[in-house]
């Protein structure tokens, strides 16, 4: 799938603020600072479409981006950020759950995990929850440029084991720095939104 253009549409905290229409959507989920905004920018080949922060927890709303005028990428607030109040974390969780459970436009979720470390308990909970809800999911192992080739097989093995992935469930090494994994991830997204090969 070739990306010709991408634009920020809106930020939303509740259902009433979601974009109207039946354009298919793919959401990006993961821990704070795992690289969701960087992955989004690399997928659409724009350096600063989604704001990147070195401070975890900066994405506090659900951000919608229109791609090729045909589908939306949706950047969800990260989970697991400790330096906010329990009340605020609970609010983010409710916001994300409401989107994932009620959004009819949603066709799939890319769960980002850091390739350098085993998935966290929260990563496992999120992946199991997506499967329980019947939402198609793929895993992007981010920061792939920071892991040596010799350690990759072990990293993949650990991620598959911890998340209990089958061989058919997509797992892609991804680097926002080198573009590794970009085409594979776009192929997965293209299948979900009905644009495979376009």
Swiss-Prot record:
Tagged with keyword Cell cycle: yes
Pfam families: MMR_HSR1
Binding site for GTP: 30-37, 57-61, 75-78, 142-145, 174-176
Signal peptide (UniProt feature, chain positions): none
Keyword Kinase: no
EngB-type G domain span: 22-195
InterPro entries: G_ENGB_dom, GTP-bd, GTP-bd_ribosome_bio_YsxC, P-loop_NTPase, Small_GTP-bd
GO molecular function: GTP binding; metal ion binding
Binding site for Mg(2+): 37, 59
GO biological process: one example: division septum assembly
SUPFAM superfamilies membership: P-loop containing nucleoside triphosphate hydrolases
Record's GO cellular component terms: cytosol
Cofactor: Mg(2+)
Keywords: Cell cycle, Cell division, GTP-binding, Magnesium, Metal-binding, Nucleotide-binding, Septation
Family listed: Belongs to the TRAFAC class TrmE-Era-EngA-EngB-Septin-like GTPase superfamily. EngB GTPase family.
Function: Necessary for normal cell division and for the maintenance of normal septation.
Protein name: Probable GTP-binding protein EngB
Source organism: Pelotomaculum thermopropionicum (strain DSM 13744 / JCM 10971 / SI)
Gene (UniProt): engB
């Amino acid at each position: 799938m070739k990306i010709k253009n991408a634009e920020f549409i809106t930020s939303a905290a509740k259902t009433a603020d979601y974009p109207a229409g039946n354009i298919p959507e793919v959401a990006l989920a993961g821990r704070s600072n795992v690289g969701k905004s960087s992955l989004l920018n690399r997928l659409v080949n724009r350096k600063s479409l989604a704001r990147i922060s070195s401070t975890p927890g900066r994405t506090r709303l659900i951000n919608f981006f229109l791609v090729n005028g045909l589908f939306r990428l949706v950047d969800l607030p990260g989970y697991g950020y400790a330096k906010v109040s329990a009340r605020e974390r609970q609010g983010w969780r409710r916001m994300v759950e409401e989107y994932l459970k009620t959004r009819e436009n949603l066709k799939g979720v890319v769960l980002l995990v850091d390739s350098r470390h085993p998935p966290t308990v929260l990563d496992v909970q999120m992946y199991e929850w997506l499967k329980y809800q019947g939402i198609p999911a793929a895993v992007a192992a981010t920061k792939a440029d920071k892991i040596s080739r010799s350690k990759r097989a072990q990293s993949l093995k650990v991620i598959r084991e911890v998340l209990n992935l089958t061989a058919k469930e997509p797992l892609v090494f991804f680097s926002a720095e080198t573009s590794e994994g970009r085409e594979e991830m776009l192929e997965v997204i293209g299948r979900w939104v009905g644009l495979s090969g376009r």
